[in-house]
């Protein structure tokens, strides 16, 4: 095993999450779920390891734990947030609830609350260097060359020495 491996639970090098002494699950599928029974979709960290306040349970629709550790017996509907049924059996009108901000009326992909890998913060755009949006949502339409730093062309079109590799 490479010493450059970084643990997704504690963010320290030298081991994988499945071997982490922090514990707390993760299982064979590791962070992000997937193969072998997985550990769910845990993202980011709070500097000291796992970020419990952002773990979202898809059984009760609350933050702080995953479904495998859910204290509620009954399942909660993602659509209306009601207890005792799931979204496919919901009789409420289709009014989506955002999993990021927990507000109704939009999906997470359209959420106005900016989030980066460390959680809800004021993100910055690498294209225009302004805060409040990410590059894919950047209002700036001009191209910026990563070789010379000037706008109006891309690196592959750069005529300056050292601009094109």
Curated annotation (Swiss-Prot):
Phenotype reported upon loss of the gene: RNAi-mediated knockdown results in lethality before the pupal stage. RNAi-mediated knockdown in the wing imaginal disks results in reduction of wing size associated with loss of patterning elements such as veins; this phenotype is reversed by Myc overexpression.
Zinc finger (CCHC-type): 5-22, 55-72, 75-92, 96-113, 123-140, 143-160
Assembly description: Associates with active polyribosomes.
GO molecular function, one term: translation regulator activity
Predominant location: nucleus
Subcellular location(s) per record: Nucleus; Cytoplasm; Endoplasmic reticulum
Record-listed Phosphoserine modification sites: 21, 142
The protein, known as: CCHC-type zinc finger nucleic acid binding protein
GO terms for biological process, alphabetical: IRES-dependent translational initiation of linear mRNA; positive regulation of cytoplasmic translation; wing disc morphogenesis
Role: Single-stranded DNA/RNA-binding protein with sequence specificity. Binds G-rich elements in target mRNA coding sequences. Prevents G-quadruplex structure formation in vitro, suggesting a role in supporting translation by resolving stable structures on mRNAs. IRES trans-acting factor (ITAF) that can promote IRES-dependent translation of Myc mRNA. Involved in the control of wing size by regulating Myc levels.
Keyword Transmembrane helix: no
GO cellular component terms, A-Z: cytoplasm; endoplasmic reticulum; nucleus
PROSITE patterns: ZF_CCHC
Gene3D superfamilies: Zinc finger, CCHC-type
Alphabetical UniProt keywords: Cytoplasm, Endoplasmic reticulum, Metal-binding, Nucleus, Phosphoprotein, Repeat, Zinc, Zinc-finger
SUPFAM superfamilies hit by this protein: Retrovirus zinc finger-like domains
């Amino acid at each position: 095993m490479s010493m450059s491996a970084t643990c997704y639970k504690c963010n320290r090098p030298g081991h994988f999450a499945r071997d982490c002494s922090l514990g707390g699950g993760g299982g064979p599928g590791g962070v992000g779920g997937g193969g072998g029974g997985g550990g769910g979709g845990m993202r980011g960290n709070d500097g000291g390891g796992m970020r419990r306040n952002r773990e979202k349970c898809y059984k009760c629709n609350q933050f702080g734990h995953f479904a495998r550790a859910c204290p509620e017996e009954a399942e909660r509907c993602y659509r209306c947030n009601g207890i005792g049924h799931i979204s496919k059996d919901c009789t409420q009108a289709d009014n989506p609830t955002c999993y990021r901000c927990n507000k109704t009326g939009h999906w997470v992909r359209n959420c106005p609350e900016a989030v980066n890998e460390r959680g809800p913060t004021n993100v910055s755009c690498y294209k225009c260097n302004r805060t409040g949006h990410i590059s894919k949502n950047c209002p700036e339409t001009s191209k910026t060359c990563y070789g010379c730093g000037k706008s109006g062309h891309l690196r592959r079109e750069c005529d300056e020495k050292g601009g094109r590799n």
